[in-house]
């Protein structure tokens, strides 16, 4: 395995952990309408769970309103049920051709709870990044034992791995801080 290949793979995995964090935080509502709130909603469509965003257009006509317009009107009631069954805490209003979702204002207590959830998701991402670093370090140590690197090269690679980890953790912290700010300010 080439020297940089280990670090490159670790950096790619760290980037994926950051992307997962951003996706997961996108589904946490912050008092404003955001189409990503519905990303985790699946509708039973002819016996198969289908993501809502593949069955309907989701628009934001007003700052706190989501409008879900199904491509096939026959599934309107199924979509309404799926939204009710999700843990969004938003009641859908079915007008016969589309579903309106009014995102309620968040109470101070709810905002604090959501901020805790944001921190917890951030911590999970940091743990994932640290596990990736540990795996990369283990691979480097094995390669060093096999004589693939001299001690100077090994220490340089260890430092590069730690630098990559520090950068990834910093990005995770920034993502979490931005989402916390969004949630707390609403």
From Swiss-Prot:
Responsible for the release of ribosomes from messenger RNA at the termination of protein biosynthesis. May increase the efficiency of translation by recycling ribosomes from one round of translation to another. InterPro entries: Ribosome_recyc_fac, Ribosome_recyc_fac_dom, RRF_sf. The keyword Zinc does not apply. GO terms for biological process: translational termination. It is found in: Cytoplasm. Belongs to the RRF family. NCBIfam families: frr. GO terms for cellular component: cytoplasm. This is Ribosome-recycling factor. Pfam families: RRF. It comes from the Bacteria. The gene is frr. HAMAP family: RRF. One of its GO terms (molecular function) is ribosomal large subunit binding. Keywords: Cytoplasm, Protein biosynthesis. Its main location: cytoplasm. The keyword Lipoprotein does not apply.
């Amino acid at each position: 395995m080439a020297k940089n290949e280990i670090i490159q793979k670790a950096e790619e995995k760290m980037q994926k952990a950051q992307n997962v964090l951003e996706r997961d935080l996108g589904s946490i509502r912050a008092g404003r309408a955001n189409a990503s709130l519905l990303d985790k909603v699946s509708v039973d469509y002819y016996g198969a769970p289908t993501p809502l965003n593949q069955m309907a257009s989701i628009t934001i006509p007003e700052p706190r309103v989501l409008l879900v317009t199904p491509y096939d009107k026959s599934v309107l009631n199924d979509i309404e049920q799926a939204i009710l069954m999700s843990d969004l805490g938003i009641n859908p209003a079915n007008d016969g051709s589309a579903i309106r979702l009014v995102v309620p204002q968040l109470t101070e207590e709810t905002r604090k709870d959501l901020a805790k959830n944001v921190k917890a998701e951030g911590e999970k991402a940091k743990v994932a990044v640290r596990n990736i670093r540990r795996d990369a370090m283990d691979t480097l140590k094995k390669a060093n034992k096999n004589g693939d690197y001299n001690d100077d090269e090994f220490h340089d690679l260890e430092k590069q791995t730690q630098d990559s980890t520090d950068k990834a953790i910093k990005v995770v912290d920034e993502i979490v801080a931005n989402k916390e700010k969004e949630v707390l300010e609403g």
